[in-house]
């Protein structure tokens, strides 16, 4: 700390001391009625407030002293988030080219999309034991190596089996990174920057998704090898992360846990610059000693977490947040944004891909807003507001599809199916009914913006660009005759509603429900349970990710498009109640202080918010709790 900053700190502390001394002089004499009780309350309150103000003053002057080293560690760590976003987002555009070149059926398309997600879920569940044994740094090095190898395999793949192998390897890498990166960032960050730096990981995830959408659009014009560039480019950030982590240290908390105290102290000092580390070091060491005593009981860590009420509640909150993040439809929006836009009436594939990049850009920009808000608003309020807006946006999106369905063109021409050909499609009466059947397409003409001579006929299994028979059988011929063919969308004047709904959804989702489940999970577990807790919550995230992404098209088929989005809106509304009742505020608290937030019953812990103007404080003195009541606090005044 500079000499000027040190002088400012000392001046501030002297002023605080003088202020607290003046406050004590105004208290009643011990012999006065209620004097002893009031004096004790006043001294307790003064001590609490003085200590808090002192810490606040030191944080204020130390804030600018945080070494650039900490920011570099957070940035290289967050490249794992970039890979997460890129590899999960790029496949939607690549699939448009792959399915034609390799003649992929529906099953193989689903395998390639969900293979990486499923592998990531397995890796995340096993990742707790992995980074607990190897360390956070080694786990991230392994993740970046897997992503590099997997991306190279994908770029060079000659068949669909090799593609699947590459996707599985990439999935293992991003699964390990998804639950290790937030923990590493949280453990190397100072308390006043922890929430913001952890949120940077989600910023990089959304940045990766946006970059993937731009890459998809740029290489969509290369029909033959464009997908190789799309899938192979992920190797570049993976190599950068691997090289960067060769020069970054291990988490000091993990080192202390493993008994490497001198190395941990040296790294902690390096990460805090000129700030004193004695208090933080002692706090970490004491918490580890207490947690080792608690963890000395036999049995798996997950069993001990479930048998100990505070960690059981923390695990329920952490896993619940990850579950509702997925059930509110985020990866339906991100994986299928181009498909959703096409469903709404956007005819051209390339236009749908470029419009999808708008949603990815919105996600990226408003994640930046979340980075700014997280330490100002707090985790609880930001998450609650985000889910409330998400619920409204999903409802608007559903209403847009409902409006389009109500004006869906009628089938006015029913051609006779050739002998031996499927005639099921000709039985549908409206375009939206026709589109819900993946084997059917809509053939029509336009007269003065009105749809005429429309029919529902089977799609050509070799190419979805034309029908199996009838007027739209030959793409070159029917286009010359001014006949139009629609597959997976209906002509409608309300196609713009989907883009508006998607953008509005991400405006609300990105600042809160995007980063907060990861931020909260990096904070709420004691050290002995942190790896396992984050592994379980990340695994839940990936499991529901697989569930939602694999069922969206079938859900839309059985419930209609608007029914699917009404369903997601219902899930988001239930998540809103969950956050209101169960999520406590962790803003500004040390990792060692957060465990006590879950001493309350689950249905009330979310309401125990000290920032709401209450005067209740708990003072830990030699293992005892002294409670300063509202009445005592009023006596202080």
Swiss-Prot record:
Keywords: Cell membrane, Glycoprotein, Membrane, Phosphoprotein, Transmembrane, Transmembrane helix, Transport. Signal peptide: none annotated. The keyword Transport applies. Residues 1-65, 136-137, 189-201, 250-313, 374-382, 519-538, 584-637 are cytoplasmic. Residues 87-114, 159-167, 223-228, 335-352, 404-497, 560-562 are extracellular. InterPro entries: MFS_dom, MFS_sugar_transport-like, MFS_trans_sf, Myo-inositol_Transporter, Sugar/inositol_transpt, Sugar_transporter_CS. It is found in: Cell membrane. Its main location: membrane. H(+)-myo-inositol cotransporter. Can also transport related stereoisomers. This is Proton myo-inositol cotransporter. It comes from Rattus norvegicus. The gene is Slc2a13.
């Amino acid at each position: 700390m500079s000499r000027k900053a040190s002088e400012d700190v000392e001046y501030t502390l002297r002023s605080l001391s003088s202020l607290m001394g003046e406050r004590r002089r105004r208290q009643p004499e011990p012999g006065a009625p209620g004097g002893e009780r009031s004096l004790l309350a006043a001294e307790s309150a003064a001590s609490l407030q003085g200590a808090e103000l002192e810490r606040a003053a030191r944080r204020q002057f130390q804030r600018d002293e945080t070494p650039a080293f900490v920011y570099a560690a957070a940035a290289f760590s967050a490249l794992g988030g970039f890979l997460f976003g890129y590899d999960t987002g790029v496949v939607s555009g690549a699939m448009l080219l792959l399915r034609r070149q390799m003649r992929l059926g529906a099953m193989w398309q689903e395998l390639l999309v969900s293979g990486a997600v499923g592998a990531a879920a397995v890796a995340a569940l096993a990742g707790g034991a992995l980074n607990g044994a190897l360390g956070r740094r080694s786990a991230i090095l392994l993740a970046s190596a897997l992503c590099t190898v997997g991306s190279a395999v994908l770029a060079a793949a000659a068949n669909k089996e090799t593609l699947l192998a590459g996707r599985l390897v990439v999935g293992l890498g991003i699964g390990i990174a998804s639950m290790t990166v937030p923990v590493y960032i949280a453990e190397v960050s100072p308390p006043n920057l922890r929430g913001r730096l952890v949120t940077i990981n989600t910023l990089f995830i959304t940045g990766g998704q946006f970059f993937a959408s731009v890459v998809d659009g740029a290489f969509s014009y290369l029909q033959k090898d464009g997908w190789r560039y799309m899938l192979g480019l992920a190797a570049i950030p993976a190599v950068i992360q691997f090289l960067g982590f060769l020069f970054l240290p291990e988490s000091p908390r993990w080192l202390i846990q493993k008994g490497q105290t001198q190395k941990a102290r040296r790294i902690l000092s390096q990460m805090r610059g000129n700030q004193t580390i004695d208090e933080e070091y002692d706090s970490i060491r004491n918490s580890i000693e207490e947690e080792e005593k608690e963890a000395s009981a036999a049995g798996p860590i997950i069993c001990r977490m479930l048998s100990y009420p505070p960690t059981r509640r923390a695990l329920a909150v952490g896993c619940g947040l990850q579950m509702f993040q997925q059930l509110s439809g985020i990866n339906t929006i991100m994986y299928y944004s181009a498909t959703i836009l096409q469903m709404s009436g956007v005819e051209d594939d390339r236009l749908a891909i470029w419009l999808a990049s708008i949603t990815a850009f919105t996600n990226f920009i408003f994640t930046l807003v979340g980075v700014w808000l997280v330490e100002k608003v707090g985790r609880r309020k930001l998450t609650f507001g985000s889910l409330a807006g998400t619920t409204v946006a999903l409802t608007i999106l559903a209403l847009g599809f409902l409006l389009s369905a109500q004006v869906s063109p009628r089938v006015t021409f029913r051609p006779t199916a050739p002998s031996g050909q499927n005639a099921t499609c000709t039985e549908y009466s409206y375009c939206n009914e026709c589109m819900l059947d993946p084997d059917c397409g809509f053939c029509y003409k336009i007269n003065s913006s009105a749809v005429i001579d429309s029919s529902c006929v089977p799609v050509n299994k070799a190419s979805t660009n034309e029908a199996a028979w009838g007027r739209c059988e030959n793409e070159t011929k029917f286009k010359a005759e001014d006949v139009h063919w629609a597959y997976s969308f209906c002509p409608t004047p309300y196609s713009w509603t989907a883009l508006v709904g998607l953008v509005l959804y991400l405006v609300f989702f990105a600042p809160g429900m995007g980063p907060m489940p990861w931020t909260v999970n990096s904070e709420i577990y004691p050290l002995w349970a942190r790896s396992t807790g984050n592994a379980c919550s990340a695994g839940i995230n990936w499991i529901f990710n697989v569930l939602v992404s694999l069922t969206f098209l079938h859900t839309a088929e059985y419930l209609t498009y608007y029914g699917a989005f009404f369903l997601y809106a219902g899930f988001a509304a239930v998540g809103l109640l969950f956050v209101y009742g169960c999520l406590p505020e962790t803003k500004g608290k040390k990792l060692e202080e957060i465990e006590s937030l879950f001493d309350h019953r689950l249905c009330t812990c979310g309401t125990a918010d000290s920032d709401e103007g209450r005067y209740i404080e708990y003072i830990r003195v030699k293992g005892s709790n002294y409670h300063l009541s509202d009445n005592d606090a009023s006596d202080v005044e």
